[in-house]
């Protein structure tokens, strides 16, 4: 029997309900005062390390709404890279870079016991501060500033008074950059989201704090640092389902003035920041992605802006976002959203769903915090991985954790261990020998679509059915835990009852494109509307040549601007163009769309299938 030391800090638990209080998140209308009890059961070897202040795993007990809850916490070991650095500037403009020791940090992810859908992102630096999801509702917790007291406030997000109810939105900037490795051709295969989600990836992340942000927080770099660490801990929690880690490689404070022109136009600020990163920052510090956080209020209620599908690019792997709220989780969601654009994910349309009212990639900030990506986001991320092959995300940064001897049986996978499922009495992993923390000799696999009870599934077992006419079903090979990469039918094969032709695994139809652009109120597409594309005016054209809008020839008119029949509030519009002044290249008919029998759109022309493919 493993020797275990039980450490318990017993504190009185008196839940107290108050009517109103001013907390870090703002004025809170309804809250509870609780006194968490820390109960930690760890092997003696794991806790007797004098250099380690914060345990790898902890438990706290307290009450919410009069019911006891147990909060399980585990340290986020991928929050920092080994070479993490901070930069600020002296009054005479000199760059000063330090490498602070952050080997024993206090930022955790967690869950509530007996709630399978619970999540938590918590700082345990000075009491418990952060948020957790319990029975589908988001709660915030923070210590009260009472001397010699362990009192904490627990409150629902909905009980925070909101000062600004204006609709906030995200911008998105599309790129046409060519990656260092060419984008895979359309005939190549897509890999599955399952394969990619469960392969670990790392975005070595750099944050720049502009002078407005620095001044807004009273030039207190320590307070800003803590705020950013808490925010990034939540961003990491959001991306965990896709097995993406976002370790912080560096933090820079523009203490003496901005190094670019930060203006109210998010578009201009992003362009300047991307150019500065390419020209300056990358020459000083290796990283995969950088974002600027600013206290500037961007035009048009924009909270942030990022390039789409640009991860790993020297200029375009960037974003800018606003310090827009006292509520840390909301700024974290904004950053996670902008980072999603860098990963090739566009805004959700009405048909996209997740388990909450709004999803991460909604174009507008929801009045309820959400940490879930939609089904659409998952598909787009999957395609980005295959088409762009972002190699910078594959390398694993060195961890900053104190290297201590592995302790078999503590439930944490450490160096020299193949598995760790806890004590033999508690182990529920059939693949793991709990006594040695090694896999059983007969184990072929641990997880995967083609793995069952630690062995490969039989060859021919269906692991992914065909999604539609353009997709193909895949079966297990019998010698791998992974479902084979997702193949699709050749471009040009008829699909959707001959209404279209397959293109890159999809069946592009103008009706679906209209609904993606305008929403569920689209009622159809009237072919006669496409004759407007012969005009060659502001929005009606087939393509651009040297910035000039080229009118469509009659044979090409179905390959220019998209027109939709739309009905809303009783009004019917038959030829509504899909056009946005600030993104005029969006709303064109998609490549591969059928424009006649045996013909598809290609670069603004209607061409024969054998020419297109």
Swiss-Prot record:
So where's the catalytic machinery, residue-wise? Answer: 338
Per the Swiss-Prot or TrEMBL annotation, the motif D/ECD-tripeptide is positioned at 469-471
Pfam families, per database record:
ADAM_CR, Disintegrin, Pep_M12B_propep, Reprolysin
Signal peptide extent: 1-20
Q: Which residues are glycosylated?
A: 219, 375
Entry binding sites for Ca(2+) 1:
204, 288, 392, 395
* Statement: the UniProt record of this protein carries the keyword Glycoprotein: yes
* One example of a Gene Ontology biological process annotation: proteolysis
**Disulphide bridges, residue numbers:** 312-392, 352-376, 354-359, 408-437, 419-432, 421-427, 431-454, 445-451, 450-476, 463-483, 470-502, 495-507, 514-564, 529-575, 542-552, 559-601, 595-606
State what this protein does. Snake venom zinc metalloprotease that possesses high hemorrhagic activity. It inhibits collagen-induced platelet aggregation and activates prothrombin (F2).
Q: How does it assemble?
A: Monomer.
State the family named in the UniProt similarity comment for this chain.
Answer: Belongs to the venom metalloproteinase (M12B) family. P-III subfamily. P-IIIa sub-subfamily.
What is this protein's record name?
Zinc metalloproteinase-disintegrin-like EoVMP2
